[in-house]
């Protein structure tokens, strides 16, 4: 990957080094915004956006620094209340907002920063990105969520959070404590979306309907992926509608929300949507 560097950043909150992949802007001499781009549930050591998400193609001519923290598997990019025996110590919100951002913006590190930040993600990363933007509106100028779930208190959001954590051997109570605790409520953007009022917001979801495009993509993949992807995307559709409606109820109409008929939860879907999503938030970062 050209223009992609791997930085190792010491995290006091997580008490370990964290590897962060950074895609440099096309023109390193010109000031550029920083776009924090969060991964899906796997959270591997190489960002899925690079492996499967078409990132290099979309940003080949763009003047933006893309920041991809790695190794956040099943974390929801949040601060956990307890260390987890399977997953370890997770303090992702603190790491991104209090440790990583100030570090990257120091002039001596050579990233020419224009003062604007965006945060974005897909699936689990969308949950983390939209929460982080809502909780830290002073930090972000734009947020983008592809196929995420933004309530933690409703039945779908609660179940998605639980399934994500347990799928990697974690205990959901180590994340936010017992269901209904202050931390569960803190992460529920649908009940308090006020932090999104003064930033550009782009949300996208398909509806889980299987079309020919999905059948073609899944030809060489196991059938359960298609079935699970359909169910998941039906869920994220309901979740996205819920946030859109909550924002409207709070008097916000600036959000750009795209509902696509046809499409299941897969990298093929996210890859196809990334160019549109980026163009939607780009003006607020330049």
What spans do the regions from the language model cover?
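Non-catalytic cap/lid and distal C-terminal segments of serine-dependent acyl enzymes
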Residues: 1-286
């Amino acid at each position: 990957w050209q223009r992609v560097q791997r930085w190792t950043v010491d995290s006091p909150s997580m008490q370990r080094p964290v590897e962060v992949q950074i895609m440099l802007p096309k023109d390193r001499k010109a000031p550029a915004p920083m776009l924090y781009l969060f991964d899906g549930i796997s959270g591997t050591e190489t960002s899925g956006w690079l492996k499967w998400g078409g990132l290099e193609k979309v940003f080949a001519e763009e003047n933006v620094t893309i920041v991809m923290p790695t190794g956040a598997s099943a974390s929801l990019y949040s601060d956990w209340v307890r260390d987890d025996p399977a997953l370890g110590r997770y303090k992702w919100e603190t790491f991104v907002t209090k440790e990583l951002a100030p570090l990257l913006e120091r002039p001596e590190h050579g990233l020419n920063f224009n003062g604007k930040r965006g945060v974005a993600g897909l699936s689990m990363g969308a949950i983390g990105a939209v929460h982080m933007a809502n909780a830290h509106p002073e930090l972000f100028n734009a947020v983008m969520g592809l196929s995420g779930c933004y309530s933690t208190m409703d039945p779908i959001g609660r179940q998605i959070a639980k399934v994500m954590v347990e799928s990697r051997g974690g205990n959901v109570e180590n994340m936010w404590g017992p269901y209904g605790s202050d931390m569960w409520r803190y992460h529920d953007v649908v009940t308090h979306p006020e932090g999104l009022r003064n930033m550009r917001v782009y949300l996208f979801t398909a509806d889980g309907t299987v079309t020919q495009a999905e059948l073609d993509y899944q030809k060489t993949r196991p059938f359960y992926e298609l079935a699970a992807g359909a169910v998941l995307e039906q869920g994220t559709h309901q979740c996205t509608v819920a946030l859109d409606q909550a924002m409207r109820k709070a008097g916000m109409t600036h959000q750009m929300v795209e509902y696509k008929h046809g499409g299941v939860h897969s990298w093929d879907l996210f890859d196809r949507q990334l160019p549109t999503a980026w163009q939607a938030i780009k003006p607020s970062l330049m």
